[in-house]
A protein has these predicted regions:
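Non-transmembrane, aqueous-exposed alpha-helical and coiled segments at domain scale
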Residues: 1-188
Length: 188
């Protein structure tokens, strides 16, 4: 028995997916950004991204699309993978009665990753961005393991404090974006 190959995921291949796969019922080209999300791991894609997708399926929240972002070198590979599939992701839900497969279309872009986080700062400073969210691993919070408090002496945090125009961390990039928003008269 020969099975047909499933095409690579992209806007143009959505109609070619197997009939049991749920696909966006909205025109993704009409979506506009409202959220920048830093840290596009599985948790984000199966929760926040899916939640917005479900609203978009109902004809709502089309001005709340997500622009993905990262601040680490390894985020570059993820950006390229998502770019190749038009920022579409797939959510597979398993239950005792079976599984569902749904293509999630709420992400429309992914900020290029640069050492100084300039593109991320510029994107977060845009007036149409209403929310910046993030999901990071435990190490990304810069908590001192002994004191359980924020580690202001961590080298990345010290760097951000002394180089506010070119921060290394997500937190430093958010501070820089807030400064840009303030200086240009855009609300926080």
């Amino acid at each position: 028995m020969q099975t047909s190959a499933i095409p690579n995921l992209s806007n143009s291949t959505l109609p070619k997916l197997p009939s049991g796969v749920k696909i966006p019922n909205y025109n993704r080209s009409n979506l506009t950004a409202g959220i920048v999300h830093i840290g596009l791991g599985n948790f984000h894609r199966a929760h926040q991204s899916w939640y917005l997708h479900r609203l978009m399926q109902q004809g709502k929240a089309h001005d709340w699309a997500i622009i993905g972002a990262g601040v680490k070198e390894f985020d570059k590979a993820q950006r390229l993978k998502l770019l190749a599939q038009d920022f579409l992701t797939t959510l597979v839900e398993l239950s005792p009665v079976g599984r569902t497969v749904e293509v999630v279309g709420s992400m429309i872009d992914y900020v290029p990753i640069e050492a100084n986080n300039g593109p991320l700062i510029a994107q977060m400073a845009k007036p149409e961005i209403k929310i910046v969210t993030l999901t990071v691993t435990e190490g990304g919070y810069y908590i001192d393991p002994v004191s359980k408090s924020f580690d202001s002496s961590h080298p990345d945090i010290v760097y951000d404090a002394t180089h506010p125009e070119a921060p290394k961390t997500a937190f430093g990039a958010m501070v820089a974006a807030l400064r840009l928003r303030r200086d240009s008269g855009v609300g926080p």
